[in-house]
Amino acid sequence: MLCSIYKSPKKEGTYLYIPKRDDFSQVPDTLKQMFGKPIFVMLVNLEQRRLAQVNVEKVKQSMQEQGFFLQLPPPPENLLEQHKERKARQTP
């Protein structure tokens, strides 16, 4: 299964996967507005490639059911909270 991947110029780390290049007909208008003008990144064969941040099966299922897959960036790490938790565990 081939898919085209686009990145959002408005939301860093947000990517849109669609089955056909430049065919955004299945993407809701509200999502298109929030996403901004898509920037083409690459064409990928999902049968032959692993993806770094998302599960290939979830991408394929979403594209079959909805006609697209939206990848959101991972939540930011709160390094201060992690440091506080480590310190609390070290205190006797």
UniProtKB/Swiss-Prot annotation:
PROSITE patterns: YCGL. Residues 1-84 form the YcgL domain. Residues 69-92 are annotated as: Disordered. Disulfide bonds: none annotated. SUPFAM superfamilies: YcgL-like. Pfam families: YcgL. Coiled coil: none annotated. HAMAP family: UPF0745. This is YcgL domain-containing protein VC_1957.
